[in-house]
Protein backbone atom coordinates (compact mmCIF):
# COMPACT_ATOMS: atom_id res chain seq x y z
CA UNK A 1 0.00 0.00 0.00
CA UNK A 2 2.17 2.83 -1.25
CA UNK A 3 0.36 4.82 -3.93
CA UNK A 4 -2.42 7.42 -3.84
CA UNK A 5 -5.17 5.01 -4.85
CA UNK A 6 -3.96 2.49 -2.29
CA UNK A 7 -4.55 5.05 0.46
CA UNK A 8 -8.24 5.36 -0.43
CA UNK A 9 -8.51 1.58 -0.21
CA UNK A 10 -7.50 1.80 3.46
CA UNK A 11 -10.36 4.14 4.39
CA UNK A 12 -12.85 1.36 5.22
CA UNK A 13 -10.42 0.21 7.92
CA UNK A 14 -10.21 3.75 9.29
CA UNK A 15 -13.99 4.16 9.20
CA UNK A 16 -14.56 0.77 10.84
CA UNK A 17 -12.17 1.59 13.68
CA UNK A 18 -13.85 4.96 14.21
CA UNK A 19 -17.31 3.37 14.18
CA UNK A 20 -16.39 0.75 16.77
CA UNK A 21 -14.16 3.03 18.86
CA UNK A 22 -15.73 6.49 18.43
CA UNK A 23 -13.49 8.12 21.04
CA UNK A 24 -10.29 6.78 19.50
CA UNK A 25 -7.76 9.05 17.84
CA UNK A 26 -6.66 7.44 14.61
CA UNK A 27 -3.31 8.41 13.11
CA UNK A 28 -2.05 7.21 9.73
CA UNK A 29 1.55 6.60 8.70
CA UNK A 30 2.02 6.74 4.93
CA UNK A 31 4.42 7.98 2.28
CA UNK A 32 4.73 11.78 2.34
CA UNK A 33 3.68 12.27 -1.27
CA UNK A 34 0.38 10.43 -0.70
CA UNK A 35 -0.70 12.57 2.27
CA UNK A 36 -2.84 14.99 0.18
CA UNK A 37 -5.38 12.33 -0.80
CA UNK A 38 -6.29 11.72 2.88
CA UNK A 39 -5.63 15.26 4.09
CA UNK A 40 -9.31 16.19 4.48
CA UNK A 41 -10.56 12.93 6.02
CA UNK A 42 -12.37 13.95 9.24
CA UNK A 43 -11.90 10.52 10.82
CA UNK A 44 -8.11 10.89 10.87
CA UNK A 45 -6.46 12.65 13.79
CA UNK A 46 -2.99 13.07 12.27
CA UNK A 47 -1.02 12.04 9.19
CA UNK A 48 2.68 11.18 9.45
CA UNK A 49 4.80 10.94 6.33
CA UNK A 50 7.62 8.56 5.41
CA UNK A 51 10.18 9.78 2.90
CA UNK A 52 9.82 7.89 -0.37
CA UNK A 53 12.57 5.99 -2.14
CA UNK A 54 13.63 9.00 -4.23
CA UNK A 55 14.75 10.92 -1.14
CA UNK A 56 18.41 11.10 -0.18
CA UNK A 57 19.69 8.50 2.29
CA UNK A 58 20.42 11.22 4.85
CA UNK A 59 16.85 12.51 4.55
CA UNK A 60 15.41 9.03 5.00
CA UNK A 61 17.49 8.41 8.13
CA UNK A 62 16.58 11.78 9.65
CA UNK A 63 12.92 11.19 8.84
CA UNK A 64 13.00 7.70 10.37
CA UNK A 65 14.44 8.84 13.69
CA UNK A 66 12.03 11.79 13.79
CA UNK A 67 9.11 9.41 13.32
CA UNK A 68 10.35 7.14 16.10
CA UNK A 69 10.48 10.08 18.50
CA UNK A 70 7.08 11.46 17.58
CA UNK A 71 5.22 8.15 17.38
CA UNK A 72 6.65 6.84 20.67
CA UNK A 73 5.44 10.00 22.38
CA UNK A 74 1.90 9.31 21.16
CA UNK A 75 1.71 6.10 23.25
CA UNK A 76 -0.55 4.09 20.96
CA UNK A 77 -2.79 1.30 22.25
CA UNK A 78 -3.21 -0.35 18.84
CA UNK A 79 -1.20 -0.60 15.63
CA UNK A 80 -2.78 -1.95 12.43
CA UNK A 81 -0.32 -2.64 9.61
CA UNK A 82 -1.46 -2.89 5.97
CA UNK A 83 1.89 -2.97 4.19
CA UNK A 84 4.75 -5.41 3.66
CA UNK A 85 7.51 -2.79 3.92
CA UNK A 86 10.45 -3.81 6.12
CA UNK A 87 10.86 -0.35 7.60
CA UNK A 88 7.40 -0.58 9.10
CA UNK A 89 8.31 -3.75 10.99
CA UNK A 90 11.34 -2.01 12.46
CA UNK A 91 9.23 0.99 13.45
CA UNK A 92 6.55 -1.20 15.02
CA UNK A 93 9.16 -2.96 17.16
CA UNK A 94 10.19 0.41 18.57
CA UNK A 95 6.65 1.39 19.58
CA UNK A 96 5.11 0.19 22.83
CA UNK A 97 1.55 -0.53 21.71
CA UNK A 98 -0.13 -3.42 23.52
CA UNK A 99 -1.70 -4.81 20.33
CA UNK A 100 0.14 -4.87 17.00
CA UNK A 101 -1.77 -6.45 14.11
CA UNK A 102 -0.53 -7.13 10.60
CA UNK A 103 -1.62 -9.03 7.54
CA UNK A 104 0.27 -12.32 7.28
CA UNK A 105 2.17 -11.92 4.01
CA UNK A 106 3.47 -15.14 2.46
CA UNK A 107 6.78 -13.48 1.59
CA UNK A 108 7.27 -12.10 5.11
CA UNK A 109 7.78 -15.22 7.21
CA UNK A 110 11.09 -14.47 8.92
CA UNK A 111 11.24 -14.59 12.70
CA UNK A 112 12.08 -10.88 12.78
CA UNK A 113 8.94 -9.93 10.87
CA UNK A 114 6.60 -12.32 12.67
CA UNK A 115 7.81 -11.31 16.13
CA UNK A 116 7.30 -7.64 15.31
CA UNK A 117 3.53 -8.11 15.75
CA UNK A 118 1.24 -9.62 18.37
CA UNK A 119 -1.24 -10.86 15.75
CA UNK A 120 -0.76 -11.99 12.14
CA UNK A 121 -3.97 -12.33 10.14
CA UNK A 122 -4.26 -14.40 6.92
CA UNK A 123 -5.31 -12.31 3.93
CA UNK A 124 -8.96 -12.90 3.11
CA UNK A 125 -11.28 -11.56 0.42
CA UNK A 126 -11.22 -11.18 -3.34
CA UNK A 127 -10.62 -7.43 -3.31
CA UNK A 128 -8.03 -5.36 -1.48
CA UNK A 129 -10.79 -3.61 0.51
CA UNK A 130 -11.97 -6.96 1.88
CA UNK A 131 -8.39 -8.02 2.50
CA UNK A 132 -7.65 -4.84 4.42
CA UNK A 133 -10.77 -5.20 6.55
CA UNK A 134 -9.90 -8.80 7.42
CA UNK A 135 -6.92 -7.56 9.43
CA UNK A 136 -9.38 -6.30 12.07
CA UNK A 137 -10.54 -9.86 12.85
CA UNK A 138 -8.54 -10.16 16.12
CA UNK A 139 -10.40 -7.14 17.51
CA UNK A 140 -13.78 -8.87 17.25
CA UNK A 141 -15.46 -5.67 16.06
CA UNK A 142 -19.25 -5.78 15.74
CA UNK A 143 -19.64 -4.02 12.40
CA UNK A 144 -17.48 -3.03 9.46
CA UNK A 145 -17.73 -0.06 7.13
CA UNK A 146 -17.23 -1.36 3.61
CA UNK A 147 -17.37 1.93 1.66
CA UNK A 148 -14.24 3.83 0.65
CA UNK A 149 -14.32 7.58 1.29
CA UNK A 150 -12.78 10.68 -0.28
CA UNK A 151 -13.24 13.95 1.58
CA UNK A 152 -12.83 17.54 0.41
CA UNK A 153 -13.70 20.97 1.85
CA UNK A 154 -16.38 23.24 0.35
CA UNK A 155 -13.64 25.55 -0.92
CA UNK A 156 -12.39 22.81 -3.25
CA UNK A 157 -15.73 22.49 -5.02
CA UNK A 158 -16.16 26.27 -5.06
CA UNK A 159 -12.91 26.64 -6.98
CA UNK A 160 -13.75 23.80 -9.36
CA UNK A 161 -17.20 25.24 -10.07
CA UNK A 162 -15.60 28.62 -10.76
CA UNK A 163 -13.12 27.04 -13.19
CA UNK A 164 -15.91 25.10 -14.91
CA UNK A 165 -17.96 28.27 -15.29
CA UNK A 166 -14.95 30.02 -16.79
CA UNK A 167 -14.62 27.17 -19.30
CA UNK A 168 -18.33 27.27 -20.15
CA UNK A 169 -19.07 23.87 -18.59
CA UNK A 170 -22.50 23.34 -17.05
CA UNK A 171 -23.86 20.52 -14.90
CA UNK A 172 -23.68 17.73 -17.48
CA UNK A 173 -19.99 16.99 -17.65
CA UNK A 174 -17.85 13.86 -17.69
CA UNK A 175 -14.35 13.66 -16.23
CA UNK A 176 -11.75 11.58 -18.05
CA UNK A 177 -8.26 10.96 -16.70
CA UNK A 178 -6.38 9.04 -19.41
CA UNK A 179 -2.96 8.95 -17.77
CA UNK A 180 -1.30 6.43 -15.46
CA UNK A 181 2.11 6.01 -13.90
CA UNK A 182 3.19 3.39 -16.45
CA UNK A 183 2.48 2.72 -20.11
CA UNK A 184 1.16 -0.81 -19.53
CA UNK A 185 -1.80 0.76 -17.73
CA UNK A 186 -2.63 3.20 -20.55
CA UNK A 187 -5.14 3.13 -23.41
CA UNK A 188 -4.76 4.53 -26.94
CA UNK A 189 -5.09 8.31 -27.22
CA UNK A 190 -7.10 7.99 -30.44
CA UNK A 191 -9.65 5.79 -28.66
CA UNK A 192 -10.05 8.33 -25.88
CA UNK A 193 -10.66 10.94 -28.59
CA UNK A 194 -13.37 8.75 -30.12
CA UNK A 195 -15.08 8.35 -26.75
CA UNK A 196 -14.95 12.12 -26.18
CA UNK A 197 -16.54 12.74 -29.59
CA UNK A 198 -19.31 10.30 -28.68
CA UNK A 199 -19.91 12.09 -25.37
CA UNK A 200 -20.08 15.47 -27.11
CA UNK A 201 -22.58 14.03 -29.60
CA UNK A 202 -24.74 13.00 -26.64
CA UNK A 203 -24.69 16.51 -25.20
CA UNK A 204 -22.08 16.09 -22.48
CA UNK A 205 -19.09 18.32 -21.84
CA UNK A 206 -15.80 16.53 -21.19
CA UNK A 207 -13.11 17.64 -18.75
CA UNK A 208 -9.69 16.04 -19.12
CA UNK A 209 -7.50 15.81 -16.03
CA UNK A 210 -3.98 14.55 -15.41
CA UNK A 211 -0.93 14.98 -13.25
CA UNK A 212 1.49 17.88 -13.83
CA UNK A 213 4.18 15.73 -15.48
CA UNK A 214 5.09 16.86 -19.00
CA UNK A 215 4.32 13.43 -20.45
CA UNK A 216 0.86 13.51 -18.86
CA UNK A 217 0.17 16.95 -20.30
CA UNK A 218 1.43 15.85 -23.72
CA UNK A 219 -0.99 12.90 -23.59
CA UNK A 220 -3.90 15.21 -22.75
CA UNK A 221 -3.00 17.60 -25.56
CA UNK A 222 -2.74 14.80 -28.13
CA UNK A 223 -6.14 13.44 -27.13
CA UNK A 224 -7.69 16.91 -27.35
CA UNK A 225 -6.19 17.51 -30.78
CA UNK A 226 -7.71 14.26 -32.02
CA UNK A 227 -11.26 15.32 -31.12
CA UNK A 228 -13.78 16.93 -33.45
CA UNK A 229 -14.65 19.32 -30.63
CA UNK A 230 -11.83 19.77 -28.09
CA UNK A 231 -12.58 18.86 -24.47
CA UNK A 232 -11.72 21.15 -21.57
CA UNK A 233 -8.02 20.76 -20.75
CA UNK A 234 -7.48 23.85 -18.60
CA UNK A 235 -7.55 21.84 -15.36
CA UNK A 236 -5.03 19.19 -16.44
CA UNK A 237 -2.11 19.16 -14.03
CA UNK A 238 -3.56 22.03 -12.00
CA UNK A 239 -5.84 20.50 -9.37
CA UNK A 240 -5.13 19.16 -5.90
CA UNK A 241 -6.45 15.79 -4.80
CA UNK A 242 -9.29 17.34 -2.75
CA UNK A 243 -10.21 19.46 -5.78
CA UNK A 244 -10.13 16.41 -8.03
CA UNK A 245 -12.41 14.66 -5.56
CA UNK A 246 -14.87 17.55 -5.74
CA UNK A 247 -14.71 17.67 -9.54
CA UNK A 248 -15.38 13.94 -9.91
CA UNK A 249 -18.05 13.96 -7.19
CA UNK A 250 -20.16 16.44 -9.19
CA UNK A 251 -19.56 14.76 -12.56
CA UNK A 252 -22.14 12.63 -14.34
CA UNK A 253 -19.52 9.98 -15.13
CA UNK A 254 -15.82 9.25 -14.73
CA UNK A 255 -13.75 7.32 -17.27
CA UNK A 256 -10.19 6.25 -16.55
CA UNK A 257 -7.57 3.56 -16.31
CA UNK A 258 -6.01 1.73 -13.36
CA UNK A 259 -5.01 4.82 -11.36
CA UNK A 260 -5.99 6.84 -8.28
CA UNK A 261 -8.79 8.92 -9.87
CA UNK A 262 -10.80 5.77 -10.59
CA UNK A 263 -10.65 4.97 -6.87
CA UNK A 264 -11.71 8.55 -6.14
CA UNK A 265 -14.76 8.08 -8.38
CA UNK A 266 -15.67 4.92 -6.47
CA UNK A 267 -15.20 6.68 -3.14
CA UNK A 268 -17.55 9.56 -4.06
CA UNK A 269 -20.00 7.14 -5.74
CA UNK A 270 -19.80 8.66 -9.21
CA UNK A 271 -20.61 6.20 -12.02
CA UNK A 272 -17.38 5.06 -13.63
CA UNK A 273 -15.88 3.16 -16.49
CA UNK A 274 -12.56 1.59 -15.56
CA UNK A 275 -10.04 0.06 -17.96
CA UNK A 276 -7.55 -2.54 -16.72
CA UNK A 277 -4.70 -4.30 -18.50
CA UNK A 278 -2.07 -6.73 -17.25
CA UNK A 279 -2.88 -6.26 -13.58
CA UNK A 280 -5.16 -8.08 -11.14
CA UNK A 281 -8.45 -6.52 -12.22
CA UNK A 282 -10.41 -8.20 -9.43
CA UNK A 283 -8.18 -7.59 -6.43
CA UNK A 284 -7.33 -3.99 -7.40
CA UNK A 285 -10.58 -2.92 -9.03
CA UNK A 286 -12.25 0.28 -7.81
CA UNK A 287 -14.59 -0.60 -4.95
CA UNK A 288 -17.88 0.34 -6.60
CA UNK A 289 -21.20 -1.22 -7.56
CA UNK A 290 -21.82 1.63 -9.99
CA UNK A 291 -19.11 0.70 -12.47
CA UNK A 292 -18.47 -1.01 -15.77
CA UNK A 293 -14.98 -2.47 -15.85
CA UNK A 294 -13.08 -3.51 -18.95
CA UNK A 295 -10.21 -5.96 -18.66
CA UNK A 296 -7.84 -6.50 -21.56
CA UNK A 297 -7.71 -10.17 -20.57
CA UNK A 298 -11.24 -10.58 -21.92
CA UNK A 299 -9.91 -9.71 -25.39
CA UNK A 300 -6.53 -11.49 -25.39
CA UNK A 301 -4.40 -13.53 -23.03
CA UNK A 302 -2.61 -11.45 -20.41
CA UNK A 303 0.90 -12.26 -19.17
CA UNK A 304 1.62 -13.19 -15.58
CA UNK A 305 3.07 -10.45 -13.43
CA UNK A 306 6.65 -11.72 -13.74
CA UNK A 307 6.34 -11.84 -17.55
CA UNK A 308 4.68 -8.45 -17.93
CA UNK A 309 6.31 -5.94 -20.29
CA UNK A 310 5.92 -2.53 -18.69
CA UNK A 311 6.39 -0.85 -22.07
CA UNK A 312 3.53 -2.67 -23.79
CA UNK A 313 0.11 -1.02 -23.99
CA UNK A 314 -2.03 -4.05 -23.17
CA UNK A 315 -5.25 -2.03 -23.10
CA UNK A 316 -5.02 -1.42 -26.86
CA UNK A 317 -7.16 -4.51 -27.48
CA UNK A 318 -10.18 -2.84 -25.85
CA UNK A 319 -12.31 -1.27 -28.63
CA UNK A 320 -13.56 2.30 -28.32
CA UNK A 321 -17.00 1.07 -29.44
CA UNK A 322 -17.28 -1.13 -26.34
CA UNK A 323 -16.48 1.78 -24.04
CA UNK A 324 -18.99 3.99 -25.87
CA UNK A 325 -21.63 1.28 -25.38
CA UNK A 326 -20.82 1.33 -21.66
CA UNK A 327 -21.30 5.11 -21.66
CA UNK A 328 -24.83 4.58 -22.95
CA UNK A 329 -25.55 2.13 -20.14
CA UNK A 330 -24.38 4.47 -17.38
CA UNK A 331 -25.58 7.85 -18.68
CA UNK A 332 -29.01 9.13 -19.70
CA UNK A 333 -29.34 8.56 -23.45
CA UNK A 334 -28.99 12.23 -24.36
CA UNK A 335 -29.03 15.72 -22.88
CA UNK A 336 -29.71 17.44 -26.21
CA UNK A 337 -31.98 15.06 -28.08
CA UNK A 338 -29.19 13.92 -30.40
CA UNK A 339 -27.47 10.58 -30.56
CA UNK A 340 -25.04 8.66 -32.71
Curated annotation (Swiss-Prot):
Q: What class of enzyme is it?
A: transferase
Q: Name one GO biological process term.
A: lipopolysaccharide core region biosynthetic process
Pfam families reported for this sequence: Glyco_transf_9
Q: Which reaction does it catalyse?
A: an L-alpha-D-Hep-(1->3)-4-O-phospho-L-alpha-D-Hep-(1->5)-[alpha-Kdo-(2->4)]-alpha-Kdo-(2->6)-lipid A + ADP-L-glycero-beta-D-manno-heptose = an L-alpha-D-Hep-(1->7)-L-alpha-D-Hep-(1->3)-4-O-phospho-L-alpha-D-Hep-(1->5)-[alpha-Kdo-(2->4)]-alpha-Kdo-(2->6)-lipid A + ADP + H(+); L-alpha-D-Hep-(1->3)-4-O-phospho-L-alpha-D-Hep-(1->5)-[alpha-Kdo-(2->4)]-alpha-Kdo-(2->6)-lipid A (E. coli) + ADP-L-glycero-beta-D-manno-heptose = L-alpha-D-Hep-(1->7)-L-alpha-D-Hep-(1->3)-4-O-phospho-L-alpha-D-Hep-(1->5)-[alpha-Kdo-(2->4)]-alpha-Kdo-(2->6)-lipid A (E. coli) + ADP + H(+)
In Swiss-Prot or TrEMBL terms, this protein is called Lipopolysaccharide heptosyltransferase 3
User: What EC number(s) does this enzyme carry?
Assistant: 2.4.99.25
Q: Which UniProt keywords apply?
A: Glycosyltransferase, Lipopolysaccharide biosynthesis, Transferase
Q: Its Gene Ontology molecular function terms?
A: ADP-heptose-lipopolysaccharide heptosyltransferase activity
**Which family does the record assign?**
Belongs to the glycosyltransferase 9 family.
Q: From what organism does this protein derive?
A: Escherichia coli
Q: What does this protein do?
A: Glycosyltransferase involved in the biosynthesis of the core oligosaccharide region of lipopolysaccharide (LPS). Catalyzes the addition of the third heptose unit (HepIII) to the second heptose unit (HepII) of the phospho-Hep2-Kdo2-lipid A module. The transfer of HepIII seems to be a prerequisite to the phosphorylation of the second heptose unit.
Per the record, the coiled-coil ranges are: none
Cellular component per GO? Answer: cytosol
Amino acid sequence: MRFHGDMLLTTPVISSLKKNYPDAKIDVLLYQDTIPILSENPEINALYGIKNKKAKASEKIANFFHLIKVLRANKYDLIVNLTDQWMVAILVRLLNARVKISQDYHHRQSAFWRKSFTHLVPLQGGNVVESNLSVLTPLGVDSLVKQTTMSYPPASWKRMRRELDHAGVGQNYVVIQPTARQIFKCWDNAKFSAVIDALHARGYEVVLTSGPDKDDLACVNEIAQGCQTPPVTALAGKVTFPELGALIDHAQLFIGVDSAPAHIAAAVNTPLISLFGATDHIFWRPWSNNMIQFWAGDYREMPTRDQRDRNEMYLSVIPAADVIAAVDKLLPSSTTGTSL
